[in-house]
Amino acid sequence: MLDVGRDQARRVALWSAGLLSAHPTAAQGRSASAGLQEAMVLELLGRLGAVQLDTISVLARSHELIAYARLGGVRRSAIESAYWGGEAFEYWSHAACILPVSSWPLFAFRRRHYRAKGERWHGRPRHDVHALKERIRLEGPISTADVGGAKRGADWWEWSDAKIALETMLDEGELVVSRRAGWRRQYDLPERVIPSEFFHDDLTDDECCAALVEAGARLMGIGTAAEIADVHRLPTSAVRAHADAL
């Protein structure tokens, strides 16, 4: 156990989050080429491991602010192209997050959990999931707009049957989201998005948790077991079980 003062703890946390160390090309700001800016954003995603998505936008959406705070004046178009250019996918980490495609195997435990659970809080989908999946296979990615809309009422969570079916398949790994258009999720087959070397569920639940605990600790730099667990919404017991390996 190390004794760390408050100032040192703050610096460790800020450094680990990428808020003390400027990217070597960040000073170029908007003068950097679009390709370089996209590469900067992808490198940032790789270092952070996950970037949370949120519908709320004041100055900008949260996934854009993450890049601005660490990379400076990169273009919004470069951020969007990097996140939705085929090198990342969207799944449940801390919340709905953008994740590098290389992390697909690490969330096998969560996909298995959803499959075993058998339903979301909405219940089992009443829409024909097989027909939806076949349509995506034949026609390519679709959004809820292509299947009648996402909602069947005024309430935020009052989803349509098609939306429930798409989200259930997303949870279970039958579909993947690697792009948004007009902020709508575009659902596709994972085998068309995730590179073959990462497209597997071979890791055990314990192996998944061990890798995500390490990733969470690296991102936090310093923190309690509960804080490290919350990076990827793991049980605190998972952090305690793998603490000796950190």
Briefly describe each language-model feature range.
Residues 1-246:
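Long, low-complexity intrinsically disordered regions
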